[in-house]
Curated annotation (Swiss-Prot):
Gene that specifies this protein: UBLCP1
UniProt comment concerning the protein's domains: The Ubiquitin-like domain mediates interaction with proteasomes.
Effect in UniProt of substituting residue 44 to A: Aberrant diffuse pan-cellular localization and loss of binding to PSMD2
Short name of one Pfam family: ubiquitin
Residue numbers carrying N6-acetyllysine: 117
Keyword terms of this UniProt record: Acetylation, Hydrolase, Magnesium, Metal-binding, Nucleus, Protein phosphatase
Tissue: Broadly expressed, with highest levels in placenta, lung, testis and ovary. Up-regulated in tumor tissues.
Protein name as annotated: Ubiquitin-like domain-containing CTD phosphatase 1
GO cellular component: nucleolus; nucleoplasm; nucleus
Amino acid sequence: MALPIIVKWGGQEYSVTTLSEDDTVLDLKQFLKTLTGVLPERQKLLGLKVKGKPAENDVKLGALKLKPNTKIMMMGTREESLEDVLGPPPDNDDVVNDFDIEDEVVEVENREENLLKISRRVKEYKVEILNPPREGKKLLVLDVDYTLFDHRSCAETGVELMRPYLHEFLTSAYEDYDIVIWSATNMKWIEAKMKELGVSTNANYKITFMLDSAAMITVHTPRRGLIDVKPLGVIWGKFSEFYSKKNTIMFDDIGRNFLMNPQNGLKIRPFMKAHLNRDKDKELLKLTQYLKEIAKLDDFLDLNHKYWERYLSKKQGQ
C-alpha cells in the first residue's frame, strides 16, 4: 500500500509518493538522497519514532503508523565543498521586499474590518498555555525564522543554525518578561524547531505559549495590497488581565508583521548565513541589555524601538 509522505528541508517541501508501508526508514532516506543530495547517514528525520525513540534504519514505515501525507522535517547537509555550504541562501522575499510600515499605519491600524478580524481570533483561536502568565511580568513576543535561527541554511542540527546567545537572552528576559513564540508557520513546525533548539526543554526559562499562522490576520494596504500580519490585539484580548500595549514588545525581522501594532514592534536584524555570521552576530546580546533597561519602565508607549540602540547607548552612558 502506497504511503505518501511530505518532507520539509532547506525551506522547501518534497513529496514522496513511491514508497509503501513495507519499505524501511533507510529506503526513505535513500529516496530523499535523490531529491536533496543529502546522504542517508547525514539525514536526521524529526518525528519518526517507535515507542518514543527515533526509528532505526531497518524499521518499516508501516510500523510508524504514519497518516498519508504526514509532514516530516529533515535536518542534514549535502556532501559538498565548504564554499558551497557557505554560499548565499535562496532569496527570501519576506526580507527583500519588506517595506517601511510608517506610511501605512494610520490607514490600517484602526480600520474597523481589521479590528473585527482580531475580535474573531480572540473568540475562535485556541491557545495552549504551556506555563501560566505571571503577575507583574511584561510580555516579550518573538518571531522564529531569521530572528532566533537561520531557517534556510543547511546544517546537520538546528543548534548549528541557532542565533548566538539565544539561551542566555531568553534566560535573562524571563526574569522580567513572559515569553511567547509567534511564527508565521504551523504549530507542528514551531514545536519541532523549539525542541531542536532546546528552547522548550530549557530549565532556566519557560515559554508561556506559542502562536502560529492561524492567529494572524490578512489586512489590505493601499500600496501593497493584501498582507498577513501578527496583531498583538489577539494576545491582549485573550489575556487582558496580564498584557496590554503598555507592557508588550515584539521582535520580528519583518516590519510589516507588526503593522497593526507599530508602537510595540522592534525590527531585529535577520540572522542569515549562520556558518559565516555565527561568530559575529551580537544582536541578542545587545537586546538582552535593552530589555533589561526598559523593564524598569511602567509604560512602553513613550519608547520608539526603532532607535533602541541609541536608547541603550544613552542609558549605559549615564
